[in-house]
């Protein structure tokens, strides 16, 4: 790969991350410059895989796209590593994996978790939703931490709490989008407990039962966030940088308290940058 191609690939990934995951992109501005390219590559990959459902109308094309990514990472099948050089996100991701010795199996588990996205199966229960968060959002935190040189068992536990907090928050933020395509990430046991009817969610009826379920989900997200922050209070600053997106999660959870289910809050890019800068400047870490 030429230097010119490498710069073009990195710029493509930065634009993709900035467009689809500004929360992580903003955090990347405050990490050591030499690690930023890998952060962006990971974020761009996550955006590609997370948005597969948005680009397909049937499960099979989504499965094929996800399998291509598996093949790229393992060097097997149609998505060989040679072919990957033609894809800027794949090329940048493979560079990051090689440079920072990132575990391929973590990326593969993330891809496997996103197979759920291309179908309309209900999320069975809270345990299944938390497992999904573990393999997606928590995995992203752990990978970013490893790029920064922080990969201890303590960091892994923080990543678990942070990932669940972020994942549950994103489920609430994405409720209108999911409901519009008759897809539910709300856990089935919580829906049953609160008397939430799936068809009413699909019709975007924000009734009391749904609000009660979301309140409980929000409390769990807040609890997970607080546990992550408590553990970060004594963590090295290098490790804390991996969790900068939590500053935004805290703000969103607060706004969700006064929002309607199908009119979730939004933070401006300036607001995201401000919250991230404050967290990056704080000692110890706070969100």
Indicate where each model-derived feature is located.
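Alpha-helical transmembrane segments of multipass membrane proteins
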Residues: 143-147
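Catalytic cores of Mg2+-dependent Asp-rich isoprenoid enzymes
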Residues: 1-96, 100-111, 133-142, 154-168, ...
